[in-house]
Amino acid sequence: STVELNTPINPKEPFTRYKYPTLNLLKKYEDNGAYIDEEEQIANKNRIIEVLGNFGVQIKTIRATVGPTITLYEIQPAEGVRISKIKNLEDDIALSLAALGIRIIAPIPGKGTIGIEVPNAKANIVSMESILNSKKFQETKMELPIALGKTITNEVFMVDLAKIPHLLVAGATGQGKSVGLNAIITSLLYKKHPNELKLVLIDPKKVEFSVYSRITNKFMAAVPDEE
């Protein structure tokens, strides 16, 4: 059955009568799981080993953990190699991999290894539908669950907004600020009854949040002065 978004909610109405949004409202993307092929992995490993070797940095092992958008290359440096020396080679490694940008995690917390995060040549889409349809989101006991994406190991990444006293979202144009805010709002709309949640959305440009005008009667707190 369809969800009538313009019908006001009675504060005394039982929660059981409310129809939550259905997942078929969200676009579904096929996930074949093949984020990066073996050939690309081997080529990147060899380039990393070559660049480090050119600067006198020897490593014991290198392994790859493939995620939807990035691959983590985990290296174990040889004895006596300074971590700072590897971190200083970040630009050289990025150049050899022809990557837009890499991130070096030195060391990886809880491990005696150094991580090099490299963007996949072809990033897979992590859809909101796949996250909200996950067992982790469906069965969460968080008070205000927000699903923000997936980790490098392809696990759904969620946090409880109720446990975050302040949240600042910042970044350059096109880096996904609006996408992140939409993910937060969508997560809450799919989990909370209108009697549990009220939103105050301030959108000076009247563009980013205009799509939420349809839920005014249910989730929007009244603001007397538009200015």
Spans of features found by a protein language model:
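P-loop NTPase catalytic phosphate-binding loop
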Residues: 17-18, 108-113, 117, 136-227
